[in-house]
Amino acid sequence: MTKLTQWLWGLALLGSAWAALTMGALGLELPFPCREVLWPLPAYLLVSAGCYALGTVGYRVATFHDCEDAARELQSQIVEARADLARRGLRF
């Protein structure tokens, strides 16, 4: 089972539980304050997930480390590739 399938199953399960509670399919008579909170719950969850994602990306960007060894290796590979292409007749 792929990660996408797991997420889709989870969303379907949560969505069907939300729909069953809000539409009264289970026969439960929820108090009015609970129903007031239940209706906008998907929007709250979506906004919360977006805030979490934004915070995670911001934290990862703020704590990003420079990879000087990898940069030197990549630059040497670029020089090597340019020399190989120049030998084959490509001009820069």
Swiss-Prot record:
GO annotation terms (biological process)? dolichol metabolic process; GPI anchor biosynthetic process; protein glycosylation; regulation of protein stability
User: What are the transmembrane regions?
Assistant: 8-28, 37-57
Q: In which pathway does it act?
A: Protein modification; protein glycosylation
Single GO term (MF):
enzyme activator activity
Recorded topology in the membrane: Multi-pass membrane protein
Q: Name one GO cellular component term.
A: endoplasmic reticulum membrane
One Pfam family from the record: DPM3
Q: Which superkingdom, per the lineage? A: Eukaryota
Q: Which InterPro entries match?
A: DPM3
Q: Is Endoplasmic reticulum found in the keyword set?
A: yes
Q: Keyword annotations for this protein?
A: Endoplasmic reticulum, Membrane, Transmembrane, Transmembrane helix
Where found? Endoplasmic reticulum membrane
What does this protein do, in the record's words?
A: Stabilizer subunit of the dolichol-phosphate mannose (DPM) synthase complex; tethers catalytic subunit DPM1 to the endoplasmic reticulum.
Q: How does it assemble?
A: Component of the dolichol-phosphate mannose (DPM) synthase complex composed of DPM1, DPM2 and DPM3; within the complex, associates with DPM1 via its C-terminal domain and with DPM2 via its N-terminal portion. This interaction stabilizes DPM1 protein.
Q: Which family does it belong to?
A: Belongs to the DPM3 family.
Q: Under which name does UniProt file this protein? A: Dolichol-phosphate mannosyltransferase subunit 3
Query: Can you name the source organism?
Result: Mus musculus (Mouse)
